[in-house]
Amino acid sequence: MNSFFVFEPTGSTTLFSSLHLMWLWNTLFLCIWSGHMARRGHCAARAAALLLLLAEFFRVLTLFICGRLDTGFLPFHLCGAAVYVCLFHEARGGQLAGELIYSTLAPGALTALLFPDWLHYPAGSFLFLSSFGIHMLICAYAAAMLCCGLFHPSPQRLPLCSIILSLYGLAVYALDRLLRVNYLFLLFPAADSPLEWAAAVLPWHGLLYFPALSLVWSTLYFPPVLRLIQKGVPDPARLR
């Protein structure tokens, strides 16, 4: 408990250690449970969205009270934006918001869980716990959204998603240069991540985003995958 309010990188958790793997197993369990509850007609997506709202509010409040809230903790990373897109989707619905979550934001959250940049904080610290918790909830929301029957992935919406992501990336790059921050890891790669490995062989590590996103989309929109999703999702009319 003494390390809860430690904000300095003094942790020693390593990538894919037993502790890291435990969090990944917890994420898998939470996603399966959320999808199962949503398929049975329960409000799993709404619960995940409300927990995301509370977690983000508590994160900002804690950082503010501790005097640590600065330009480096604004919600401009992909997963920071995902919190608000999930909240918007739960409140207003919309297939485009759902498509962004399914195609990009949830895979981004999963990638962050696989290669977290917060492992250098103490394992019991606020930043360590809240970072895992928020990313897990984004994945859980996506699972519930997908299994409740109210959203159906469509590759026809990907061109518009690409435009939105490109504009967002350009805006964040300008913000990074202006505030001297590193949102979306555009200026330099996160430690112990594929971006850092790409920096050793590519002229700019950000070039990895393009083949990575192409691979993700090829998998998520592979026709057998879409048919499997469609087969496993209940008819929304039966849930009313």
Named regions from a protein language model:
Residues G35-R46, A91-E99, C148-L158:
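Membrane-interface helix-boundary motifs at transmembrane edges
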Residues R59-C66, L114-P122:
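Juxtamembrane "helix-exit" motif on the non-cytosolic side of transmembrane helices
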Residues G41-E90:
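A glycine-rich, hydrophobic loop/mini-helix early in the fold
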Residues S18-W25, G67-C79, L100-Y102:
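Structural signature of hydrophobic alpha-helical transmembrane segments
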Residues M22-S34, G80-A91, I134-C148, G206-P224:
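Hydrophobic cores of alpha-helical transmembrane segments in multi-pass inner/ER membrane proteins
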Residues F5-N26, C161-L167, L179-S218:
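Membrane-interface transmembrane-helix boundary segments in multi-pass integral membrane proteins
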Residues P116-L165:
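A contiguous pocket-lining binding segment that forms or flanks enzyme active sites
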Residues L51, L100-A109, P159-Y168:
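Central hydrophobic cores of alpha-helical transmembrane segments
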